[in-house]
């Protein structure tokens, strides 16, 4: 079988490094390029171990190796992808900057493995337009969307996304407001980056995933349900018209959906999972415990509000992790920022989306400053 070429965007992050783990175990894909932001030490290690000859740097660091092709700056990812035109691009870039990375990947790759949430949340209309133009394969990497991708049928009654409930799922509502960063970062199931772990505790990440599912599977909001599933074994399910439910059950290991996206439709051998005596529980999220999640109904039909929601969360989570606001302040920053964007016109271009994002960042920062000054 001919080797396919791969570029990993965000190679030094959580999904990026787990993608590298898969490549060590399974043959058939050759890594030809990576991007990273600032983790120079790990980037050097990856380049050496995988004999990578192409590197895009989005941060302000120097990569000194005359044998490597290096692209730097805000357009480094687009320029590298245009030069390499890989068979597969793994978009593991986190944050809003992932939108540009996804669009460039769709332009220059045959398959895009999508592990960036913001691209569909904020720019789903742009991603779908590019998909239609280029005919690129788009395969989700998030465990929930990978699960739905695997069991989806032409007619479904409901799609069910599962959630862990985050580190505070068993806390009393009266105490959640004052949870510390070290409390919130103790995720009960997954080992993830700091922001997504906080987003799990607020269930903002699940709000993102509902919006992603609407875009990926062209589903109406009403057909998507979210259930808190403590065991972390069921990643997604579809309820069929005849009463059957199809679900994907596997250990909480991101290498499974990563390998599925890379090698689809072939399944590669990882570690087998054997059925045993287990119980599976499913609960509805509590609006009092997860108020930010329940803002979904307000934002679902507006890319402007969705973009503002994401930007406000980005600012609020950073402020919480730095000890500037309480955990309960995250929801308040998001809610107050959204108030400023009610009735805002729908974006039509990438520039429109980026303008809304940066406006929302500024507004959220002002709200955060106010909350910080009130010791909230």
From Swiss-Prot:
EC number: 1.1.1.267
UniProt pathway: Isoprenoid biosynthesis; isopentenyl diphosphate biosynthesis via DXP pathway; isopentenyl diphosphate from 1-deoxy-D-xylulose 5-phosphate: step 1/6
Name this protein carries in UniProt: 1-deoxy-D-xylulose 5-phosphate reductoisomerase
Keywords linked to the UniProt accession: Isoprene biosynthesis, Manganese, Metal-binding, NADP, Oxidoreductase
Residues reported in the UniProt entry to bind Mn(2+): 142, 144, 209
Any GO BP annotation: isopentenyl diphosphate biosynthetic process, methylerythritol 4-phosphate pathway involved in terpenoid biosynthetic process
Cofactor (UniProt): Mg(2+); Mn(2+)
Protein function: Catalyzes the NADPH-dependent rearrangement and reduction of 1-deoxy-D-xylulose-5-phosphate (DXP) to 2-C-methyl-D-erythritol 4-phosphate (MEP).
Residues engaged in binding NADPH: 12-15, 39, 116, 118, 193
Matches recorded under InterPro entries: DXP_reductoisomerase, DXP_reductoisomerase_C, DXP_reductoisomerase_N, DXPR_C, DXPR_C_sf, NAD(P)-bd_dom_sf
Similarity section: Belongs to the DXR family.
Pfam families recorded: DXP_redisom_C (PF08436), DXP_reductoisom (PF02670), DXPR_C (PF13288)
Residues reported to bind 1-deoxy-D-xylulose 5-phosphate: 117, 143-144, 164, 187, 200, 205-206, 209
Catalytic activity: 2-C-methyl-D-erythritol 4-phosphate + NADP(+) = 1-deoxy-D-xylulose 5-phosphate + NADPH + H(+)
Record NCBIfam families: Dxr (TIGR00243)
